[in-house]
Design a protein with these regions (language model features):
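Surface-exposed, charge/polar-rich loops and edge strands
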Residues: 1-5, 12, 64, 98-101, ...
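N-terminal active-site beta-alpha-beta segment that forms phosphate/nucleotide-binding
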Residues: 1-106
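Short beta-strand segments
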Residues: 46-48, 113-114, 145-147
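Charged helix-capping and loop-helix junction motifs
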Residues: 126-131
């Protein structure tokens, strides 16, 4: 399948997920219990849309962490300190922070990355904009892909610009990559 066909397959599959809320809660629990998340100071987290793994429950439970969310600026994303009372909807119908406190020091930082599909070695199929791949290039932060178990497949074809995750967390597993 082409990347576009895989994206369509994943979008359809996401809509068919049974017990989504329970799976979201288990993924939240798995993220919160992850040793790297526990010891990190900064968490970069996407603001979920209806068919993605819900991050709002997770955000409400992340205590004593600096939480940042992405905002699209020109053709890239940057992460700004999250204030859930100060958000706007962007052209893709995704909530974004309006604040001005942008993270520039990525020491002690974990990023939770959305995707349509992930494979068992940490490869990710995104939405096609390349925003996360561009952002993650040349940054040393720990990358965690979050997805439902149904969207974790054995193998994805990747291109040179695709950035691999360090770990994948689903409702069933969290798996550190080699």
């Amino acid at each position: 399948m082409t990347k576009q066909e895989l994206r369509q397959y994943a979008k359809t599959k996401r809509k068919e997920i049974v017990n989504k809320h329970e799976k979201d809660l288990q993924i939240t629990k798995n993220v919160l219990n992850n040793p790297l998340v526990l010891k990190s100071k900064n968490i970069l987290v996407y603001l979920s849309t209806p068919f993605e793994v819900d991050t709002f429950e997770l955000i409400s439970k992340l205590k004593n962490k600096n939480i940042y969310a992405p905002r699209i600026e020109k053709q890239e994303i940057n992460f700004y300190k999250l204030d859930l009372n100060n958000l706007k909807m962007n052209k893709y119908h995704i909530l974004e922070p309006l604040g001005t406190d942008k993270i520039t020091n990525f020491q002690d930082t974990v990023i939770l990355v959305p995707g349509l599909l992930f494979d068992q070695t940490g490869n990710r199929l995104g939405y096609g904009g390349g925003y996360y791949d561009k952002f993650l290039r040349n940054k040393s932060l720990f990358k965690i892909g979050v997805c439902y178990q149904e969207l974790l497949i054995p193998r994805l074809e990747v291109e040179e610009h695709d950035i691999k995750m360090d770990m994948i967390i689903t409702e069933e597993i969290w798996n550190l990559q080699d």
